């Protein structure tokens, strides 16, 4: 798992270095695809439940599962790149939200505080603790910075399966009381918003999730 996670992180760095105005998310997908193969792995999203690309690229108001396409990124956009590699029998998953050129102060705050919220959620986890301590830490930080917490999409178990049984809400859910034990592997991937955390219906592609109010995430 550590090797797969490290490989995913290296791929994300390579893709992130290419993020710039005028670059298309299709081009980012191509970079990720080739980098994944160069590692000796396979891009986990490709053909997963019909998903057509090797990474997810979620721009501006897209919460998650954005499908790369031919539209160029423009100055001031923000884009989340979500990389997962299948390597040596297990999946490694990581993502980051990146600024395209210069972005506004609100967008910088969103990027920074979402990362801090994720780190605080990770720090809260530990053997013998219920999984809901993760969401409690994330939600507390988000609300302190007046950011919305998307509830429809949550972290998940990962390992030999891309998505396994454990569920990791990014908000405090008393019912999420699975006790964490050594050896568990799961994702912590909070999706925070500048406005309402409510989701609009999925796009016609059946993947792309966006904020109902069109605010950035």
Model segments located where?
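Active-site neighborhoods and metal-handling regions in enzymes and metal-associated proteins
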Residues: 2-217
């Amino acid at each position: 798992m550590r090797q797969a996670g490290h490989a995913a992180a290296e791929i994300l760095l390579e893709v992130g270095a290419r993020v710039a105005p005028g670059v298309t998310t299709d081009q980012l997908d191509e970079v990720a695809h080739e980098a994944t193969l160069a590692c000796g792995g396979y891009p986990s999203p490709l053909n997963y439940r019909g998903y057509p690309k090797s990474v997810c690229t979620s721009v501006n108001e897209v919460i998650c599962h954005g499908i790369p396409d031919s539209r160029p990124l423009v100055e001031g956009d923000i884009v989340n790149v979500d990389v997962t590699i299948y390597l040596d029998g297990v999946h490694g998953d990581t993502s980051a939200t990146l600024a395209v050129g210069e972005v506004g102060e609100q967008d910088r705050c969103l990027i920074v505080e979402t990362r801090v919220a994720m780190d605080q959620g990770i720090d809260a986890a530990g053997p013998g603790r219920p999984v809901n301590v993760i969401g409690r830490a994330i939600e507390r930080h988000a609300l302190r910075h007046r950011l919305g917490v998307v509830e429809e999409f949550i972290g998940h178990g990962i390992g030999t399966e891309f998505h396994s049984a454990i569920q990791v809400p990014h908000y405090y859910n008393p019912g999420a009381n699975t006790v964490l034990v050594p050896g568990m592997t799961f994702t912590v991937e909070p999706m925070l918003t500048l406005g309402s955390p409510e989701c609009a219906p999925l796009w016609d592609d059946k993947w792309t999730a966006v904020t109902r109010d069109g605010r950035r995430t």
